[in-house]
Every structure is written in structure tokens, then in C-alpha cells.
Amino acid sequence: MSASHFAKQDSAPVNPHGTGRLSRREFLAASGALLALACTGSLGAGQAHAGTRYASFASESSEPTPTLSDETYRRVSFSAVGDNLMNYPVVEAADANAGTTGDGWFDFTPMYQGVGDIVSSHDLNFIDIETILGGDDLGLSGYPVFNSPSCLAEQITGYGWNLCTTATNHTLDMGLTGILNSCATWAAQTNMLMTGSFSSQEDRDRIRTCERNGMTFAFLSYADDFNGIPIPSEAPWCVAQAGDDAMTSDVTRAKEVADVVIVAMSWGSEYEHSPNDLQRHYAQHLANLGVDLIVGFGPHVIQPIEWYYGYDNDGNPTGTSTLVVFSLGNFLSNQPYSYANVEGCFTCEFERLGTKGRATITNLAWTPLVNHISSGWHQVFKLKDYTDDLAATHESIGLESDPRGYCYNLTQQVIGPSGVYIDW
């Protein structure tokens, strides 16, 4: 067992597919009506049998997959959180959580307990792995060139996240060696579907898919910037760089094998609550390609949720629409700005009757989160569980005149106009 293993014992647009705003009672009832999971394949992220272009992962359940008829109603629930950003104070706190400090053991799991019920109650759970797990033997490091403990992969997967991206502006922080180490680390997690960085051209060409309740999901990811670090010339395949041509090729292949295509995007201007022109360009391009959902991150702050409509090359409407969550904000981090610690968890459901036609996205909701930082204590809380007394102790939010009110007002200002249900 590695010495870095975890502890010895983180006006509103109308939804063209369905209901955009629900009462809390309706939303919770819908979220509670989760159907059994069914997952195909036995391969870890980044692994596949020789010759295949697709990678998938298996469910922990040994129950047989139920037979679904063409008239079966299918529903799959989804959640997404933002940047798992391993600033070194967060790593030091995980070291302390594990017991004796400096012994190479880390426990990040207490930091995530505020969202445990969300993760456990949804079929697909996405998290952005903002900083590379480049291999502990390269030395752990924080800002500005990160290398995070490899045990994070096991702890995050064990906590219930099963979709992650490693395509961020920090992917190249440890060079090609770090990427190859990261790919091997994530490939060992059999219930995690990772994409965004790759171990070979063959690996880059594989479309990651998983099946839930009779629907097949494809998962793609891109980053638009690597902090000025060039992609290694000998390994142009090692990370998915955003670009119209690459996206067109990947989405076209993904739609051949999946009912739903989800794209994760590392993009945006740092600390800006409004999407920039490049974000909007890529959102429209992906909408034109027929992507179902885009989940964004990178600015370290929350940004709006909007619907985009698809058009063909002649400018004619295709009749499809794409939901764009421009930025989920940070998730777990140590950034010293109030606005960088107000974040969210986006949830929705994918629904379809039978095997034909496009899945619809329903029951859109946003659970406001706060990344709490206080005297070495790091933990994510739901805003509705975040008391005034606790908010007053936050190292940055606590300096606001009304700490908890600040979190509420910022969420309302940015997410409120989107028209999604906010779970206050």
C-alpha cells in the first residue's frame, strides 16, 4: 500500500424540454423517485480491450440488468460540482485529518460530507479534478504548479463520484510524466469514468460511455488554456484542447454510440461572473453539434445557466437545444476571496420514453454551496445548513457585513435569472 494512501482508517429562459422551475416539494419528490442503476462493461476509465474505440465502466451492483421495452419510461439523475482545487492548505488539512502529520497519509473525505446526500442519491455524479495527480514520487506541490496526492482518486471514487475530468489549466503542471501517472491512477478506479487527459493516441480516440437505466451516456471534456505550458510535441494526444475541429469529430463519434452527450469545459475568465466571448462561441458550436449538456468550470466563481439552440451550417434551426451550466464555481479550495467560496451543485434528470427520440432534461436545480475556510478547517457546506455563526468565522466571507446574506445575494444575482429551482 502506498504511503500516501488515505487515512488510517469536499427574464428566465424557458426549458424547451420540460419543467424549468419546480416547487421544492416537486423537486424532492422527483429526485427521490430514482430508478435502479445498470452499467455495462468492466473497464476502468482510460482502459479498453484492444481494438475498441470506446471505454466504459461497470456498476458495483451484481444485479442483472432489467429488460427494458420500447415503451419503458427511463429516468437518470445527474449531479455536478466544480473545482476540486488542491491548494496546499487543503492538503495540509487532509494530512491533519489522517492523524499524525507528515507521515504521508491524507484524508479528504470529511471535507466533502456536506454534499454526501446529493452524491448518494444521484445516478451520475460529476466532479472537476482541477489539479493533477501526477505521482507522489514527483513531490507534492500547491499553487502555482500543482501536484496533488494520488490517494484523492480512491477517496473521490469511494465517496460516490463516478464522472470526472482532468482537462484543466493545470493538466500539464507535471508534464507528460505527470499525465501518464494520473491516467494510470484513475484507470485503477473501476467505478470512475475519467476523460480529458490520455495515455496514448488510442486512448485519446476512445469515447467514454456508461449506461444507466437503459440510456447510454457519452462523456467528453476539453480545456481552452494550460497556463502557457505547451502540449508536448511528442504527445499531442495527451490532453483534450478545446477547438471546433476536435469537438466536431468527437461529438460526431459520441452521438453514434450514445443517447446523451455530456461535455465538461474548462474555460472562462478568472473571477468573472459573466461568460466571455470564447465561452459563448464554444457553447454555440457544441449546441450546433447536438450536445445535450455542457458543465463548465474554471473561472473559480459561479456563472449563469442558459439554454442554447442548435443551427445547421446554413443557419437553419435544427430543433435541438443544449443546456449550458457556464461555471459551477470552486468546490474545495483555499482561495482567499469571498466570491470564490460561493459555489453550487447542479442537478437534473434525463428522461426518455422508449428507445427512440432525444432524452429530455428536467428537474433542473441548483443547491448553493459554501467552501468553508477557518483556522485550518476546510469543508463544503450547503448554504441552507450554513449558520450565521459559522459564516462569521469564514476567513473571507466572515469579513462581509452580512456573511450569510452575501452568499445568498450572490447566488440570487448570478443563478436566479436562470430560472432553475434554487434549493435554499
Residue spans for each PLM region:
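Acidic, metal/ion-coordinating pockets
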Residues: 51-424
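N-terminal secretory signal peptides
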Residues: 1-22, 30-41, 49
